[in-house]
Amino acid sequence: MTDLAELVDHVIGVDPDRDRVTAAVVSVTTQGELAAATFPATRRGYGQALRWAKTLTVDERRAWAIESTGSYGAGLAATLAEKGEFVIEFDHPSTRASKDGAKSDSLDAVRAARETLGRKTWATPRSRGLREGLRTLIVARDSAKLARVAAINVL
């Protein structure tokens, strides 16, 4: 497998939450953080994040390491993929730092970028076709079950 450092000059680590995404640009050569910013978790916010990253990474040699591409990071991952960006699913993050109390969205974003750089293999996010539709139906069904049980308990 090709080393990620041979393919890109910058890795943008992303820690998504329900309402916002926090991104941090890390240089491949120094592994130093160039900048970090937070954007709304909306289509418009995703566009802002991409424009921000383009101003910091003038070349097109960048990768996005996004946590939770199956949930909170799905919208950003899909938007970036549509724009032709190199998106990597950052799974199984190291939890040591958060156990030590050093937990923040910007630290998590930097950690995502740096840990992705250290890996020999990486995953691309799953497509959002039938699998995503089925997941949505299951969530809706489970929610309806909970509402039904709550209504019965009220009676």
Predicted regions and their residues:
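Phosphate- and other anionic-substrate recognition elements at nucleic-acid/protein interfaces
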Residues: 1-155
